[in-house]
Amino acid sequence: MSPQTETKAGAGFKAGVKDYRLTYYTPDYETKETDVLAAFRMTPQPGVPPEEAGAAVAAESSTGTWTTVWTDGLTSLDRYKGRCYDIEPVPGEENQYIAYVAYPLDLFEEGSVTNLFTSIVGNVFGFKALRALRLEDLRIPAAYAKTFQGPPHGIQVERDKLNKYGRPLLGCTIKPKLGLSAKNYGRAVYECLRGGLDFTKDDENVTSQPFMRWRDRFLFVAEATFKAQAETGEIKGHYLNATAGTCEEMMKRAAYARELGVPIIMHDYLTGGFTANTSLSNYCRDNGLLLHIHRAMHAVIDRQKNHGIHFRVLAKALRMSGGDHIHTGTVVGKLEGERQVTLGFVDLLRDDYIEKDRSRGIYFTQDWVALPGVLPVASGGIHVWHMPALTEIFGDDSVLQFGGGTLGHPWGNAPGAVANRVALEACVQARNEGRDLARQGNDIIREAAKWSPELAAACEVWKEIKFEFDTIDTL
């Protein structure tokens, strides 16, 4: 035995497998304002006590490993370790628990969502002692939130850029999402924008394919945008997807969009990655571009109720990483979204201070200390009959995005856009007059359709369309 080993052994070092509870389960711990707090939904393996499982989560996502190591004595574990400070059973679920874990702020690099996620969810989700694990919520302390620049511009600056106030913004995803030539794509954009929409959008998987290279698309779309803008007198935009295979190529596309003078670009932030997203957000801030964020791949991560990461966490991560819009689901359309849960993370995106509210899935009070807000985008299977509900649910600070609900109009793209704009204006006026959109919504749409043949035709086409499936992700 070497002298160093003898010295360490004499100081009390004892090799062996760790009992995590002895070090990482601390029910008497009082959380600090600077702690990053996490709420995990755990499903331990049979025979594993919840206290041991919660302690293992805290250990494996902070300083711990499976065995005792002599280098533990070279640092202060009490200063740097994560702590499981509370465990509660999930009502109505067998062998599921919410484990609350506190992490010291010094564990995380300033301004890096990538490092935050690598630490908290990077390894522990494959831990054998757990059958399943889901990160339900994070509390980002004000001291850490201040290290992020957040959205490039935020809600108020976007409204000022667009000179549009007092109503939700209207958008449309161009369809078919793949296969159009750049010139025909630009034509579809023009028809939608001249009909009354504020934005049109590249679908998330439109980047630079053989049928439509990115530079051609950018050129034709810019021409369409400026033509519609000149005809209507309104500022228009199209979300040009800058997502690419490398960060260098992505930044080149963003720079070209800036040279063309368009107001907004787009990024697929989960498939592109947080590092790329933050870099693009910084570029947009410095160069006056709005940044639309698509959440492609989110359901792979967030849809299962007992394993993965809840979208409210991904939404918080996006607000820190940077984006002016993000898709959030609709509550009423074809995509997953329970009302109270959706409204919870919509508030986390828009508001400065959000109180803890378990009825909406918010586990911690969140103070963003004036980090700019993000506009929620409602899209997926919505049409004119949904307009009253969408206006009532999402309010003015939102983007209501109709793809098939615009392009599927029997008279074409421009009449489809007219129908949506008329429906929106009618709902906003009715709301401002004190009418109840939830109860009188259909009547409001019918009244507006009497003087808008485009809206009347849309109402007839989609009168029977519903997506009535039970949501998977409930409280």
UniProtKB/Swiss-Prot annotation:
GO (cellular component) term, any one: chloroplast
An example molecular function term from Gene Ontology annotations: ribulose-bisphosphate carboxylase activity
Propeptide intervals in chain numbering: 1-2
Xref: Gene3D superfamilies: Ribulose bisphosphate carboxylase, large subunit, C-terminal domain, RuBisCO large subunit, N-terminal domain
Co-factor remark: Binds 1 Mg(2+) ion per subunit.
Post-translational changes noted in the entry: The disulfide bond which can form in the large chain dimeric partners within the hexadecamer appears to be associated with oxidative stress and protein turnover.
Residues under site feature: Transition state stabilizer: 334
Compartment annotation: Plastid, Chloroplast
Function: RuBisCO catalyzes two reactions: the carboxylation of D-ribulose 1,5-bisphosphate, the primary event in carbon dioxide fixation, as well as the oxidative fragmentation of the pentose substrate in the photorespiration process. Both reactions occur simultaneously and in competition at the same active site.
Stored PANTHER family: RIBULOSE BISPHOSPHATE CARBOXYLASE, RIBULOSE BISPHOSPHATE CARBOXYLASE LARGE CHAIN
Protein name in the entry: Ribulose bisphosphate carboxylase large chain
